Structures are given as structure tokens and as C-alpha cells.
Amino acid sequence: MANPTCKMSKSRRDKRRAQFNARTKAAVTVNCPHCGEPTLSHRACRHCGHYRGRFVLNKAEK
């Protein structure tokens, strides 16, 4: 059976695994409970600035 000839470092191993995970996992979107706009989960809403029922982003008035 084939054996590795050189030890692979942890950083090199993790870089290889990160490429696989980046391609296979899709972004999870949910609707904001405050305004109803689609947002990424576990992130503040870009449209209204709310996260977990609190106002966290200061949106400048145009």
C-alpha cells in the first residue's frame, strides 16, 4: 500500500480541506423577522440593521 513520503503540515492539510468545504457548502439565507428581507443567517440585516431583535447597524439617512 502507498505511504506518504513526507509529513504533511497541519496548515497545508487544513488549506486543502478548506477548499473542499468552500465549494460544497452553500450560503444559508433566512428572512429577517423585522423587515422580511432575505439575509444571511447569524448576520445583521443589511436592509434594516436589526440582529436578534436589536438595532445594531447605524444606517445613514440619504
From Swiss-Prot:
<dbReference type="GO" id="GO:0006412">
    <property type="term" value="P:translation"/>
</dbReference>
<dbReference type="Pfam" id="PF01783">
    <property type="entry name" value="Ribosomal_L32p"/>
</dbReference>
<dbReference type="GO" id="GO:0003735">
    <property type="term" value="F:structural constituent of ribosome"/>
</dbReference>
<comment type="similarity">
    <text>Belongs to the bacterial ribosomal protein bL32 family.</text>
</comment>
<protein>
    <recommendedName>
        <fullName>Large ribosomal subunit protein bL32</fullName>
    </recommendedName>
</protein>
<dbReference type="GO" id="GO:0015934">
    <property type="term" value="C:large ribosomal subunit"/>
</dbReference>
<dbReference type="InterPro" id="IPR002677">
    <property type="entry name" value="Ribosomal_bL32"/>
</dbReference>
<dbReference type="InterPro" id="IPR044957">
    <property type="entry name" value="Ribosomal_bL32_bact"/>
</dbReference>
<dbReference type="InterPro" id="IPR011332">
    <property type="entry name" value="Ribosomal_zn-bd"/>
</dbReference>
<keyword id="KW-0689">Ribosomal protein</keyword>
<keyword id="KW-0687">Ribonucleoprotein</keyword>
